[in-house]
Amino acid sequence: MRVKDTLNLGKTKFPMRGNLPKREAEWEKNWEDQKFYERRLKLNEGHERFDLHDGPPFANGNIHMGHALNKITKDIIVRSKNMEGYYAPYVPGWDTHGLPIEQQLTKQGVDRKTMDRAAYRELCRKFAMEQVEKQRTDFKRLGVMGDWDHPYITLLPEFEAAEIRVFGKMYENGYIYQGKKPVYWSWSSESTLAEAEVEYHDVESPSIYISFPVKDGKGKLSEENTYFLIWTTTPWTIPSNQGIAVNPKFDYSVVEVGDRRYVVGTDRLSAVAEILGWDSYKTVQHLKGTDMEYMVAKHPYIEGRDSLLMEAVYVTDDDGTGLVHTASGFGEDDYNTAMRYGFDVLSPMDNKGCFTEEIPDPDLVGKFYTDTNEIVKDKLSAAGNLLHYSTFVHSAAHDWRTKKPVVYRATTQWFASISKFRDQILDQIEKTTFYPAWGKTRLYNMIKDRGDWVISRQRAWGVPLPIFYAEDGTAIVTHETIEHVADLFAKEGSNAWFTHPVEELLPEGFTSEHSPNGKFTKETDILDVWFDSGSSWSGVQALGRAVHYPTSMYLEGSDQYRGWFNSSLITSVATNGVAPYKSVLSQGFTLDGQGRKMSKSLGNTIAPNDVIKQMGAEIIRLWVASVDASGDVGVSMDILRQVSEGYRKIRNTFRYMLANTADFDPEKDRVAYKDLRKIDQYLEVKLNDLVAESIVNYDKYDFADVYKLVFKFITNDLSAFYLDFAKDVLYIEGKDSHARRSMQTVIYDAAVKLAKILAPILPHTMGEVWGYLKEKEEDVYLSNFPEIEDYADADDLKESWGEFMKLRDDVLKALEEARDQKLIGKSFEASVTVYPGEAAKAALDKLAGEDFREILIVSNLVMGQGEVPAEAKQFDQASVLVRRAEGEVCPRCRMYRTDLGADSRLPQLCGRCASIVAGDHPEILEEGLED
């Protein structure tokens, strides 16, 4: 037998390389075949619930890194909650109605305007379901576990029926009404938009100053050559002007410039004078805003049209002139002010953004709104009322799908009246927990300031508004009509609205005093898609999915404060008086490595599927766990490669632990905590602290800290310390020796507990690790998080070993200096004498009996007494003297020893090794030992 054959060298089939792109798919198939998701829930039946309700991604195309961040975060939460013992189901969902589906069909050459509506909607449904299947495959490949065979999908009949009932309950409670008021209008989509469907981009717009001649100053202001001065960026709205708003609290000045007089906000006077080039002007009169109410101005270029002066507190002195041009059909503030003063709504624009015959200037009829800016400018100039024209760049509202500008346009729509139950919504926000905490203020302010919600859309693909109209135009919505439509939708889906005549959509024998002839028509608009997803708390119940209401958590990107968090809150409070969620967790956006938004034009997008093919889903999952996703997070191939280095460190550490516990049977070889060596007890205590802190961080949804704690423990406590000196015990000591079994107990515990703690983050790899451990559960996911132990001596151990670690730092510094001086090479070539200070000596006394030589990996260690030699190095905790070790290297333990050949039967070994080999391999005494 050779010397190396007497060593307890670790062996394992756990591969160094994960080969993740290939093997992950095999593990995922095994999860599904073995029904681990269902079995985990079965284990937790009857336990406290944790329901994370999935915000439905839109079913359109393969997933991107934002999807990966979101879905993996949810999976980490659900897995960790289940491993904590909660009953935590996960039901994935999809949002499947809306304009993007219609746009995709248009790209395929489908023209909805030439098709039967029901047939067109069937094409939409088919396309949407194809996208669901595509994304389902993508999400599962990320290692996301859930009830993938029974998702909730907004186009499913039972879901649509539930949505109809939500609408009906809101109508019954008095929260739904029809009105004509300005809403975001997308001429490119020919539909209204919700606030959540609007995004902002920089555009170049006109900036013009216009004078309105005073017609009636109410005895307070001269009409002769006197003008109200306004500023606007939308010349195309000037023909529809109905009034001028002034702030009742502001001071206004009448200034003389040449032969004209202008009324301007006093605080804006100097800025306006500079812009208009008034080198000299004279203030001739002061007015209060309240003085000007009900004064009348002439339209700046249309004969016979007047403009009423009205009070409005929203008028600011931040820009403009302090007087605001008002057109009721093209602005929410304009509308509200005009209504207070008894005006009819004037909105002379069609669905495509072109002016209708209602426009007071016939020259503009049929023209696209922005094309009229130059015409209006020229007419103002000809009338002598254009004082200044320039352009400027500013942020303007755009359709989030078409990327085209949108306008405020007054149209007849259906609304949810937020103002009627705003206080209830705000009260529910106060009762909700937010991660991060600032989310509460953000959502609160959004609800506090938001207007009523326009819920009707002029599109084809969506859930129809379940409204009928009588012969006299009266809208009909009753409990009976809602239930009849909902029951029909539950059986046939919402296409029934378009395949059945109105008589079959109404309850049998339905009559109304508003239809003496029994004739009815049905609404052609559909519900806003945000009403679809906003009703998901109800739809998922109607589908019989395992999600309780109110649910434990909603988790989505921070854009959903004005989207899904918002719409879900409104529908739930409106129908049931409670928020649909107990907590809300929001995430930032995924940016590239330089902090830029990802876009195809910049070429900086990363597809999760491409990363999976190159590196594996585990690397994406570890990236998700490593970042603080409460804000925006960067991702690039370079960043992912750095993450993969961290993964490699974790994997290699597990490989070492598995190899060196391969001959350890926890049932018979385990050493009880009280019998462990003190250094091993210390590591058990450190491991226990790690488990406790990790679970706390899981409960705070702070996965970045879980990862940091684990990685720090693996790197510092294990690799750089415990496992570094472990070889001297694991390889050298007797196979069944107390020292070796004591250390193996700790290493095995570390492998088990770290596998459990990392399982929610790295389920593929930790499942693989689990297969090499001797635990009763078939998979790590079927186990629970480690129990947190109560070690009575934990604080004393941490204090004593903490002092020793400071002493160790001093010794390592001394060894490094000796290495620099070429006195030694490796640390085992050294003989070290330590003269400890008081704190270190006290710690060493408490740790009496420990083999500090072994821990410091030196051949000889002496605790010096008496006077410190001059050549010793002075450090914080001790003085350290390093000399080259005497003797020869033992070929087995690699330490310098002076007792080689002490046992004549094994002359090449030191006394320690000879004793161990004789005990473990007595046959060698007969056969002899080769080098």
From Swiss-Prot:
It is an enzyme of class 6 (ligase). CDD domains: Anticodon_Ia_Ile_BEm, IleRS_core. It is found in: Cytoplasm. Binds 1 zinc ion per subunit. The keyword Metal-binding applies. Zn(2+) binds at residues 890, 893, 910, 913. One of its GO terms (biological process) is isoleucyl-tRNA aminoacylation. It comes from the Bacteria. ATP binds at residue 600. GO terms for cellular component: cytosol. Keywords: Aminoacyl-tRNA synthetase, ATP-binding, Cytoplasm, Ligase, Metal-binding, Nucleotide-binding, Protein biosynthesis, Zinc. It catalyses: tRNA(Ile) + L-isoleucine + ATP = L-isoleucyl-tRNA(Ile) + AMP + diphosphate. GO terms for molecular function: aminoacyl-tRNA deacylase activity; ATP binding; isoleucine-tRNA ligase activity; tRNA binding; zinc ion binding. Its EC number is 6.1.1.5. L-isoleucyl-5'-AMP binds at residue 556. Its cofactor is Zn(2+). A motif ('HIGH' region) lies at residues 57-67. A motif ('KMSKS' region) lies at residues 597-601. IleRS has two distinct active sites: one for aminoacylation and one for editing. The misactivated valine is translocated from the active site to the editing site, which sterically excludes the correctly activated isoleucine. The single editing site contains two valyl binding pockets, one specific for each substrate (Val-AMP or Val-tRNA(Ile)). Monomer. Catalyzes the attachment of isoleucine to tRNA(Ile). As IleRS can inadvertently accommodate and process structurally similar amino acids such as valine, to avoid such errors it has two additional distinct tRNA(Ile)-dependent editing activities. One activity is designated as 'pretransfer' editing and involves the hydrolysis of activated Val-AMP. The other activity is designated 'posttransfer' editing and involves deacylation of mischarged Val-tRNA(Ile). Belongs to the class-I aminoacyl-tRNA synthetase family. IleS type 1 subfamily. This is Isoleucine--tRNA ligase.
